[in-house]
């Protein structure tokens, strides 16, 4: 995986610089999402590794599947990936691009795992409290994890806040063993 990130980084950096220069970080991010989803599809993976498909055919396939409304710069970016046989790196390129975009915009990703669904008001309050604590804007991704029993577990960057019943029980068990 680290090797993939090393290979993907120059492409992500180039995409970010192009997007920032054009003032189009949002559209590039959406385009990379579509391209990464296409590259991760099993049938598209088979096409990428099929030696019978020419570079032109592969390029046209990706443009047809994910490239509706692409600017000439985005089309050229896809062409570079095809020519350098890097289409399989699109998920990593997208992830690195999002990191660069978030850093540029002063935003961090927050992953919130909850034992039960959070209503919009609760999520908005939690997000506001976290933004105040971390002094940054947050993009939140919420997932359900019934194994938490109750409460939430929040991961922002390298920091994890475990306010779940399962986490408290684990801490209690560790304290009793000592």
UniProtKB/Swiss-Prot annotation:
Topological category with respect to the lipid bilayer: Peripheral membrane protein
Keyword terms: ATP synthesis, Cell inner membrane, Cell membrane, CF(1), Hydrogen ion transport, Ion transport, Membrane, Transport
Subcellular location, principal: membrane
Cellular component, GO annotation: plasma membrane; proton-transporting ATP synthase complex
InterPro entries cross-referenced by the UniProt entry: ATP_synth_OSCP/delta_N_sf, ATPase_OSCP/dsu
Subcellular localization, as worded in the UniProt entry: Cell inner membrane
Signal peptide as annotated in the record: none
Keyword Membrane: yes
GO molecular function annotation: proton-transporting ATP synthase activity, rotational mechanism
Similarity remark: Belongs to the ATPase delta chain family.
Subunit structure: F-type ATPases have 2 components, F(1) - the catalytic core - and F(0) - the membrane proton channel. F(1) has five subunits: alpha(3), beta(3), gamma(1), delta(1), epsilon(1). F(0) has three main subunits: a(1), b(2) and c(10-14). The alpha and beta chains form an alternating ring which encloses part of the gamma chain. F(1) is attached to F(0) by a central stalk formed by the gamma and epsilon chains, while a peripheral stalk is formed by the delta and b chains.
Function: F(1)F(0) ATP synthase produces ATP from ADP in the presence of a proton or sodium gradient. F-type ATPases consist of two structural domains, F(1) containing the extramembraneous catalytic core and F(0) containing the membrane proton channel, linked together by a central stalk and a peripheral stalk. During catalysis, ATP synthesis in the catalytic domain of F(1) is coupled via a rotary mechanism of the central stalk subunits to proton translocation. This protein is part of the stalk that links CF(0) to CF(1). It either transmits conformational changes from CF(0) to CF(1) or is implicated in proton conduction.
Protein name: ATP synthase subunit delta
Organism of this sequence: Aromatoleum aromaticum (strain DSM 19018 / LMG 30748 / EbN1) (Azoarcus sp. (strain EbN1))
Phylogenetic placement of the source organism: Bacteria, Pseudomonadati, Pseudomonadota, Betaproteobacteria, Rhodocyclales
